[in-house]
């Protein structure tokens, strides 16, 4: 069943489970992911980057919507790291149930302005909106890029941002990086910031790029 991100992550937060997200760039990958989703009865986020969205055939997007609508497992179709207002609007028109506007590299006030604009349009269509504060690093081997220096999400700024924009979910920067981590690269995860953000904000948080990353555990 099709859901937006706000609806799905609200349930996930209440029940205490995480929701995986997979970038879908081909019919083969879509079929493989959906087969596992149905077998495991696991909610999932099917997403596309702006490059994928701009270059794949519309038939793949329609296949994503069709596969999601014919299963009883919750499925979100999400535009990840939307780089322009126009791209986000096209994704909404194409049937995406969730969009991200990533203006985190812009000055703070500009980030607020474009995010507000996206929320106004998306919420009219019952599409949830994700935004980002701070920056995600790079391992040097990902097409998604990232920055060489990580700017961690500031909890006070995050609270102000959420209140002013009306976003539904927030992607936070706690030290992860896009791509697969080389053996000699050790991320400096700030789980303390993540906890403060969780305690401060009343919307679901999104944290990205955990591929091949071993999280610390309490002994």
Where in the sequence are the language-model features?
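Short, surface-exposed connector motifs at secondary-structure boundaries
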Residues: 13-18, 42-44, 71-73, 198-204
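Alpha/beta enzyme core
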Residues: 8, 27-44, 61-62, 66, ...
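Hydrophobic faces of well-ordered beta-strands that scaffold small-molecule active sites
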Residues: 19-22, 44-47, 75-79, 99-101, ...
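Conserved small/polar residues in nucleotide/adenosyl-binding loops
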Residues: 211-217
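Glycine-rich anion/phosphate-binding loops
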Residues: 82, 108-114
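N-terminal basic/disordered segments at the start of proteins
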Residues: 2, 23-27
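N-terminal amphipathic alpha-helix/helix-capping segment at the start of soluble metabolic enzymes
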Residues: 1-19
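Short glycine-enriched loops at secondary-structure junctions
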Residues: 50-52, 81-85
């Amino acid at each position: 069943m099709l859901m937006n991100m706000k609806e799905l992550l609200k349930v996930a937060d209440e029940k205490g489970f995480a929701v995986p997200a997979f970038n879908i760039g081909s019919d083969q990958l879509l079929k493989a992911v959906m087969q596992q989703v149905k077998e495991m009865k696991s909610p999932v986020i099917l997403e596309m980057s702006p490059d994928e969205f701009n270059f794949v055939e519309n038939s793949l997007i329609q296949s994503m919507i069709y596969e999601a609508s014919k299963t009883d497992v919750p499925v979100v179709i999400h535009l990840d790291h939307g780089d322009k207002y126009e791209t986000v609007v096209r994704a909404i028109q194409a049937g995406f149930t969730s969009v991200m506007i990533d203006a985190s590299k812009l000055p703070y006030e500009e980030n607020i302005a474009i995010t507000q604009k996206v929320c106004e349009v998306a919420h009219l269509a019952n599409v949830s909106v994700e935004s980002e504060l701070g920056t995600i690093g790079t391992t040097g081997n990902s097409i998604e890029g990232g920055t060489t220096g990580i700017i961690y999400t500031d909890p006070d700024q995050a609270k102000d941002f959420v209140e002013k924009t009306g976003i539904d979910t927030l992607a936070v920067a706690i030290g992860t990086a896009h791509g697969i981590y080389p053996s000699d690269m050790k991320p400096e995860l700030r789980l303390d910031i993540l906890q403060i953000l969780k305690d401060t904000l009343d919307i679901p948080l999104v944290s990205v790029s955990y591929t091949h990353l071993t999280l610390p555990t309490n002994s």
